Amino acid sequence: MMKRILKWAALLLAALTLYSLFCALSIVRYAERDESAPADCIIVLGAGTDGKMPSPVFRERLHHAVTLYQEGYSDIILLTGGYSPGNEHSDAWIAGAYLQSLGIPEDAVLLEERSTITQENLRFAKEIMENENLSTCILVSDPLHMKRSMMMAKEYEIESFSSPTPTTRYQSWRTKLPFLARVTFFYVGYQVYKIFAKV
């Protein structure tokens, strides 16, 4: 009996490992996809702040959003990110102030200030889009983060165009691999969660 249990456990582990590797490859391939097209708004997924300035990763996303805005893809930028512990302002507010320093007018920016994770970024952004009568968006994040983000956007029925940042803080494989492993873990975990949520 115990041998049979161990055998099935080993098979399950092997299957999960192979599936995770497949997902990792899919994430890497998807990272190269840029679907930028005219849309009602540009959603920038949050990536933390130090209380005064967006993190380096967040700044890369903001710079890309500014480029899309200046190139005429949309005239509204929707920033996401709630309050980090100890911070006076939300991550979205700090990002908004940063955009203003880059010349983006205040009335071109919408703030989503409740979220703490990617799933909430999109759920609460969806509510703002509905309130503002916005139907489509360009979704901005890091290349390796795009597949999971687009999957979640689809879950919330947000018509989105993938637009990964052309530059990223994860340049070498030394920095890419840990980030890819983390993204893959959460990607697979979210799919498993959806399966059990339906049971």
Protein language model regions, located:
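A transmembrane-helix-recognition feature enriched in membrane-embedded lipid enzymes
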Residues: 173-199
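N-terminal type II signal-anchor transmembrane helix
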Residues: 2-34
